[in-house]
Amino acid sequence: MKTLLVFLSFLTSISLHSQSSINAIDNYVCPPCNSSCDTIIFDKPGTCTHCAMPLITEKELKKKYPKNKKRKIAFYLQPGIEILDFAGPMEVFAYADFEIFTVSKTKESIISQGILTILPDYSIQDAPEADILAFFGGNAAQSFKDPEIIKWIQSQPNIEYHFSVCTGVFALANAGTLNGMTATTFHNALDGLEKNYPEITVVKDARFVDNGKVITTAGISAGIDGALHLVAKLQGFNEARKIAYHMEYDKWTPGEGINLSLDNPYDGFTNIPNLENYTGTYEYLDNTEVILKINSREKSLYAVVYKRNYPLFYLKKDKFINLNGDEITFIKDDNNRVIGFRSSRNYDTLYKKLK
C-alpha cells in the first residue's frame, strides 16, 4: 500500500511538472505595426509571416507596448528651421501612425526659411513626455547653444530614441547625447562637427548613421531616409517600403546608411534567392495579365498592371505580400519550376504562369 502511494505521488508530481512546463511555454507575437498581424499568435520564436518583424513574447509585448499606446515623437522647431528637414520626416511618421507634436522654446510663432509661419504645440516649459526626440537644421548653430534648450534635452526622461536631421545634430552634440558615438550631418557642417566635437566620430558620406538608439542623418532630403529607417526598425521593413511607395519616394534605397545597431531591419531582405524564378507573365483578374519583374534597387519584385509598378514585399521562400495585405504564394511543380501563384484573397484560384 505504501509503495502504491509513493508511486501515485510520483505520477502526480510528474503531472504537475508537465502542466507547469506547458504553462511556462511562451506565446509569441508581432510588435504592433498597425497591420492585421497585430492579432496573430505564434507558438515559437522567429519572424512574423505577415510583416517579417522579429517576434517577441506576450510578456515583452505588455511591458514594451502598453495597450493602445502610440509612440510619441516630439519635433523641436527653432526659428529659421529648414522646411524639408522636418516636413519630410513628419510625413513619414504620420503615415506610420506616430503621435507627433511640435515643441519650441516658447509658444510664440516661428518663421521657417522666411516663408512659413509655424505655431508650436508646446514650449519647453509645458511639453509632455515623448518616446522620441527629433531635431532639425536651419539656424541650428545659434539655437542649440542656448543653455535652456540643452538643459531641456538633457532633462527628458524615458527617451527611447534620439533623431536628428541635417545640422539638428548640434542639439545632440551640445547635450552630450552623441559622446562616444558616430554621426553625420549636412555636408557643409561636417568639418565643423568633427573639429569642435572630438568625442564624436564623424562620417562624411552616409545618408544616415544608426547607433542603436541615436540616429543622425545628412542634410535636408536625407531626413526622409532616416525616418523610413526608423520606421523599419520599429514596424518592419515592409511597412517602411509601403510608406515610401505611398509618398512616391519609392526610389528610396533601403539601408543606404551606416547601421551600427544590433538590430538590422533589412536582414533577410537584401539577398532573396532566385528572384528570377518568379519573373514572367501570369494570368490575372478579369482575363487580364500581370507581369512580374525584378526590382533590382530593392532586390524584390514589381507587379506590373496596366503599365504601373506595384511592389511585392518578401516574407519568406515563395511567399510575398502586396500593398493590400494579400499574401501571394508561388506554386511549383515537381521539378521546382514556378507554374503560377495563389492569392490569399482567393486561394482556390491558381493564376497560371504563361511565359
Descriptions of predicted regions:
Residues K70-K72, T182, K213:
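Residues that mark the start of a beta-strand
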Residues T167-G168, H187:
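Flexible, surface-exposed loop/linker segments and immediately adjacent secondary-structure boundaries
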Residues K59-H162, V169-T177, K204, S221, ...:
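Extended, subdomain-level signal for the structured scaffold at the beginning of enzyme domains
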Residues N179-D205:
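A conserved active-site-flanking secondary-structure segment within enzyme catalytic domains
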Residues S18-Y65:
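Intrinsically disordered, low-complexity terminal tails/loops enriched in metal-binding residues
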Residues V203-I215, E248-Y249:
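Conserved Rossmann-fold dehydrogenase catalytic segment
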Residues M1-A24:
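Bacterial Sec-dependent N-terminal signal peptides
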